[in-house]
A protein has these predicted regions:
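P-loop NTP-binding core
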Residues: 1-150
Length: 150
């Protein structure tokens, strides 16, 4: 199983949107996919509940309580994890431990850029990332061609 953690310490950058879009796209390609919601708002779980029955299946996992982290079925191709906002400390370490890819959404704003840079610096302090066992990727969200940072 491959696991993608969608995370950023900055709120409002589209973590949930990116997570649910990734999960749906992977499921449409025929992969066995679960979407773990680690955000107390539970937006990913609500999105799964609202999907039409004919949509490609995505298995819901409720990781909002710390002890549930890591609880995933064995027969999955992909696990997509929707991280909470302000992820740090032990929670960040636990979620990164479950992941081999980390996607950090970034919106085109000076404030978001600064917060994301700080988040990426903190990720580098986590041993799994530092040793190259979890790759880190930044995804531009709500960006338009030719548009400068606000």
């Amino acid at each position: 199983m491959r696991a993608i953690l969608v995370a950023n310490a900055k709120g409002g950058v589209g973590k949930t949107t990116v997570a649910v879009t990734l999960a749906a796209a992977l499921a449409r390609q025929g992969h066995r996919v679960a979407l773990a919601d680690a955000d107390r708002q539970g937006s990913s779980l609500r999105w799964l509940d609202a999907r039409p029955p004919e949509a490609a299946p995505v298995r819901p996992l409720d990781w909002r309580r710390g002890k549930a982290v890591g609880d995933a079925p064995k027969k999955l191709d992909w696990l997509v994890i929707d991280a909470p906002g302000a992820i740090k400390g032990d929670k960040a370490e636990a979620l990164v431990a479950e992941s081999d890819r980390i996607v950090a959404p970034l919106t085109p704003s000076v404030f978001d850029l600064a917060a994301t840079e700080a988040f990426l610096d903190r990720l580098e302090e986590i041993r799994r990332v530092r040793k190259g066992k979890a790759s880190v990727h930044v995804v531009a969200n709500r960006a338009r061609k030719g548009r400068a940072l606000n």
